[in-house]
Structure formats: C-alpha cells, structure tokens
C-alpha cells in the first residue's frame, strides 16, 4: 500500500496519517513483540580500558503475524520512503456492535476476541509505537468522545441496529474536529 501511495503521489504529501487497530482486533491478530533479543559480543570502554562484553542486542521484530511486527514493517517502510514527512498514527475508535450480514457479525468492544484480548490492548500497542518509532500518535479512542457502547451515542454512527462501528456524518465531524486540534500542533515536514 505504501508503494502504491509513493507511485501515485511521490513526495507530494504534507503528512502521512495511518488509522489502525480495529480490524486487527476483530481479526484476532496476536500482539507480538517489538523486538527480538540475542546475546552478542560487543566492544566497549570504561575507566580508560577497552574490553569485550556479552550483552543482549535487540532488533525489530518483522513478524507480520503480529500487530507489533506489522507496525514495525509498515513504519520502517514509511520512514524509508518519506524521511522528511510527518507520519502520524491514530488509535482506533471505540467499537459498538456491527452486523454486515450472515458470517460478518462483530460484537462490541465489551467482548474479548479469540486471542482473549479487548480493543484496549490494541490501543495500548499503538500508543507504544510513539516511543519505538518516534512518531506522534493521536489517541482518538480517548479524545474523540465517540462511545458507541452507549445508546445515546448511536446518533454518531451509521445505524443504531446494525452498524455502531462506522461513524456517520456527525460522527466524522466530531472525529475531524478532534484531528484538527491535534494535528495543528504538529509540524508537517522536516524540510
């Protein structure tokens, strides 16, 4: 997807915004680890003397079967393609019930997925990304005010009976206002 974006628009972007997590939760994706570790010999100096030590060395996990691994793969690729652009991640919104037909019923966030995880676990991983990859993360899970698990908030979602997952026009307006205030505090480019 990032290659397609780069082919179509090249460097002509102000910023790259990645909204992720909700499909990973619904798809029962394991969280995984940010790093793998291996003991290695390393040269170092201290007190005027050089010597060799054995220390754990961590490298980024590129395990695409996990959320952290997928984030690492995507962030490495984005950082390499767009080193002068601001990259911003968004946490998912809260999730209400959704039914898109037989075989596609999605319980609300009040239920664990098949990994035994709640949506909050995925939100936490996305928030951690800021520290691993030096990118801002806008926590729309917390800041948007959209809470489809409460019937009074169904007015912001597509259908109160079948789609409390996707925001409607008013829900998008709330999300847009949240993003406007958060994004205005960030520089777009480093040039």
Task: Please place each PLM-identified region on the residue numbering.
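Alpha-helical cap/lid subdomain in secreted, periplasmic
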Residues: 2-191
């Amino acid at each position: 997807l990032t290659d397609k974006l780069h082919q179509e628009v090249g460097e002509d972007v102000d910023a790259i915004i990645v909204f992720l997590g909700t499909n990973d939760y619904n798809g029962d994706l394991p969280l995984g680890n940010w790093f793998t570790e291996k003991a290695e010999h390393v040269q170092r100096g201290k007190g005027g003397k050089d010597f060799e030590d054995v220390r754990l060395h961590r490298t980024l996990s590129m395990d695409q079967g996990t959320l952290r691994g997928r984030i690492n793969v995507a962030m490495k690729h984005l950082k390499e393609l767009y080193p002068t652009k601001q990259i911003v991640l968004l946490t998912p919104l809260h999730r209400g019930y959704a039914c898109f037909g037989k075989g596609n019923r999605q319980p609300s966030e009040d239920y664990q997925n098949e990994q035994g995880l709640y949506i909050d676990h995925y939100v936490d991983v996305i928030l951690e990304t800021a520290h691993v990859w030096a990118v801002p993360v806008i926590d729309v899970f917390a800041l948007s005010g959209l809470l489809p698990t409460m019937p009074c908030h169904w007015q912001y979602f597509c259908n109160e009976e079948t789609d409390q997952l996707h925001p409607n026009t008013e829900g998008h307006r709330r999300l847009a206002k949240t993003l406007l205030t958060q994004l205005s505090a960030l520089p777009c480019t480093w040039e």
